[in-house]
């Protein structure tokens, strides 16, 4: 009786597993928010894997932060350089904008497209020059950046050869090679791995000569190896640890061998390591039979498989980073999210770096100061300094959003201190500080004993303004805004002024300082700027700032306004600052008028018009924009005042504080009022003469 033919054993491959480092998702989130927006074009990425280095744990293909394109201007990146532990593998990422789009992806078509790329590389010979293309992979994903959760699915396209590859023999490499051969093969492998030129080349040839000397060569050198060996093996870095199965990369490797060289019997070498050195006890050597079905050509594209299983099921994986992230870092990402989303569609030209780096000084931490601070935070501004001398009163928390009942207990917390604490509680990443300080005011004379303290406050205020980029004038009285207005004009700092009446409000931005404007103009397009500066808060006054606090009734001492005014005015003040920061001319930007400007086509002002003044009334639910030029007689920002301050310094400030008429005399307002009074008297005389003539007639 004839013996029964032993059935062929089909070669089984251990699937390749994926691993995604958290850094990859963080980097991808930044790329999505900052650059991609709604663009869902495929992204070239790089995965990394290496030979198995543990007898019980397989190696994974890993995505790291460096897996994404390094060139921010291009989403098609060349394969990153690897090292002995990170062999680079090209891949493609398909990220969808909605979970519905993710679920509707044609996964079979995507897999086939990537498999076709591998086959084209095999046919063109590229796979011989760069074998890393053989384990090419793809990833589909959906990133919910609001919740910091990610859904993803890997595929490792692998060809299904028909008929299947038959396994003839498989054994540990230490049993296949003689002791002399094993020693030489180990040394050759270690040299290959130690060389910077070959350490990350995962496919190679192992040639053993008749005198037991081993050498390792590139795949493209196969013809040079013909007849020069006793044993020739096709080696590859095997990520699998199993003793009876080779790893997934061998599948496409065998397809390459069959297609390029028409070999029917192949010896393969599954290279594995232990502690960074070749381990022939873990490594495998096998013999496989590769045959073509009748009528099939070696150039026919085989079918492909490769979607990774998740716990044995064909479903995607998901990960949430919210729980693992530092709460402050998570808050920073969440706060930045809405701003970055603005750039996707609504405002692509928005410069977020300018906003995040600006330093704001808030003079006044009352009703307006609280509203301004909250709105600044919404725009991503992190550096805020409060200056205030008052304490939190029982009446404050309901109108001033940064304070609560506990801040009022005892004698009350200083507002500048309580405001800082509140901002930190709202958003821990805020860089904020509070300064408890009174602002010296003209019309409020001081004694000689107080001079040192007042001048110290003046110096400190000047230093604060110099160290900040924008200053908000939000104090309760008009005269308390004079010194900050002067110092801002002197330092050429952005000054935003907001003031409230009972049912009306005024928000304005000050123009550039008088002595700095001429210097800045040399670097600006003259056609885009006004030849005259924009005015400040005091430019329309014909009197110097005076004491507005003495001899006042209770309703005049307190800020009595309709509660809705402060949120409106505070928001407008911040929007005005953001407009200035986004404008190419900054503080020198001209004042726009809402009735004359075209808000739909303004390249210089991406946020819309940039007015000089905004005045509104809630009693009439109306709002208008006004334009006012700087006055040569202004008591705060005129060149006369700034020059006098620079020349006299402290003595000038003391004289302005102690002598109410000094500023009027200095700027010529005294003479102007005298001329106006004389003009009125002349008219009265003329009217009297005319009456006399009429009577005579």
From Swiss-Prot:
It comes from the Eukaryota. SUPFAM superfamilies: Activating enzymes of the ubiquitin-like proteins. The keyword Protein transport applies. Constitutively expressed (at protein level). Disruption phenotype: Increased number of peroxisomes and accumulation of peroxisomal proteins. GO terms for cellular component: cytoplasm. CDD domains: Apg7. The keyword Protein transport applies. Keywords: Autophagy, Protein transport, Stress response, Transport, Ubl conjugation pathway. GO terms for molecular function: Atg8 activating enzyme activity. Gene3D superfamilies: NAD(P)-binding Rossmann-like Domain, Ubiquitin-like modifier-activating enzyme ATG7 C-terminal domain, Ubiquitin-like modifier-activating enzyme ATG7 N-terminal domain. The C-terminal residues are required for homodimerization, as well as the interactions with ATG3, ATG8 and ATG12. The GxGxxG motif is important for the function, possibly through binding with ATP. Belongs to the ATG7 family. PANTHER family: UBIQUITIN-ACTIVATING ENZYME E1 (PTHR10953), UBIQUITIN-LIKE MODIFIER-ACTIVATING ENZYME ATG7 (PTHR10953:SF3). This is Ubiquitin-like modifier-activating enzyme atg7. It comes from Arabidopsis thaliana. The gene is ATG7.
